[in-house]
Amino acid sequence: TIRISKTASNNTTGMTITNSGTIEATTDGSAIFGAGATATATVTNNSSGIMTNSDSSNATIRVGASSSVTNSGTIKNDVGNDAIKLYGNNSTITLKDKGIVVGKLDALLRTGSTLKINHGAGQSYFYETEGSFTLEDLDGNQVVKGSAGSVGQGGSETLDELLSYKS
């Protein structure tokens, strides 16, 4: 586990973590953990990077306000648990092509959170989100609000049927 700060009252800000290996929470806790809402960090998980956690009470990555998380590798928790938790306002998650996220993207009770998706034109994806995100597909695909999802053009036979359900 990499702790961004020891306690919520003793926050570190401006930390940069770039991962190309494996960061694993082997006991209770997160792979990357910011204790307080102001524990600011920039986390980049490169294509060979793997971050894992199987603790139902903690996200795999938890960062504070004005933080950014960019994933091109694998970020994994159990399916119903948080993979990435934004613990402060005005943070951004960017999910890049061929990156894998298992678990929820959580911005519950936070404001100004942005989810940017960059999987390529016409690609399909689905992410379970919790809380309020501004959704951006950087390749121009239409994002279906609710949880973040898009249907690739390869499934054009069902595209019109699925998009009719968007809210």
Regions found by a protein language model. Give the residues of each.
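Beta-strand-rich solenoid/repeat architectures in extracellular/passenger domains
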Residues: 10-29, 42-58, 68, 72-81, ...
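Structural detector of coil-to-beta-strand junctions
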Residues: 1-3, 8, 29-34, 57-62, ...
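Parallel beta-helix/beta-solenoid
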Residues: 12, 27, 38-40, 64-66, ...
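A generic structural signal for beta-strand entry/edge sites
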Residues: 40, 58, 112-114
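Ordered, small/hydrophobic-rich secondary-structure cores
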Residues: 78-79, 84-87, 91-93
